[in-house]
Amino acid sequence: MTEQKQVKKPSARRRARECTVQALYSWAVSGNTAEQVELAFVLDQDMDGVDKPYFRKLFRQTIENIETVDFSISPYIDRTFDELDPIETAILRLAVYELRFELDVPYKVVINEAIEVAKVFGADESHKYINGVLDKIAPALGRK
């Protein structure tokens, strides 16, 4: 009898975070407005299993608060935003938005979700970088 590894489907919120990272990436590199990116994303992407209202909230609110989010990140990264991989930037922006504004989400959940998203979309070791940066930011935001 062969054992089959059971693949766990990501939660609706994790899928919302994955979609938010993809949309933030697209917004940053395309030069399109947030509204254009969101509309194109919802029309073009598979949104099955996604907490759509949470996706919309995360995407819109992260962009609405981008200056505050970036200001919270910049002291804790070892390079400029221009030198960061755009996916890492999108993951950090989403996580810092959640750490700063979504206080009902435990900080450990925010950091773990960011790490898991980085494992899916980031370079080989980017999840370690994301973890290190967020471990420094969380206490600075009063979340540890």
From Swiss-Prot:
Q: What is this protein called?
A: Transcription antitermination protein NusB
Q: Which InterPro entries match?
A: NusB-like_sf, NusB_fam, NusB_RsmB_TIM44
Q: What GO molecular function annotations does the UniProt record carry, in alphabetical order?
A: RNA binding
This chain's function reads: Involved in transcription antitermination. Required for transcription of ribosomal RNA (rRNA) genes. Binds specifically to the boxA antiterminator sequence of the ribosomal RNA (rrn) operons.
Going by the UniProt record, its keywords in alphabetical order are:
RNA-binding, Transcription, Transcription antitermination, Transcription regulation
What GO cellular component entries does it have?
cytosol
SUPFAM superfamilies (alphabetical):
NusB-like
Looking at the Swiss-Prot or TrEMBL record, what is one Pfam family this protein matches? Answer: NusB
Q: So what family is this one in?
A: Belongs to the NusB family.
The record's annotation in PANTHER family points to:
ANTITERMINATION NUSB DOMAIN-CONTAINING PROTEIN (PTHR11078:SF3), N UTILIZATION SUBSTANCE PROTEIN B-RELATED (PTHR11078)
Species of origin: Haemophilus influenzae (strain PittEE)
Spell out the Gene3D superfamilies in the cross-references. NusB-like
Entry's Gene Ontology BP terms: DNA-templated transcription termination; transcription antitermination
Look up the domain of life of the source.
Bacteria
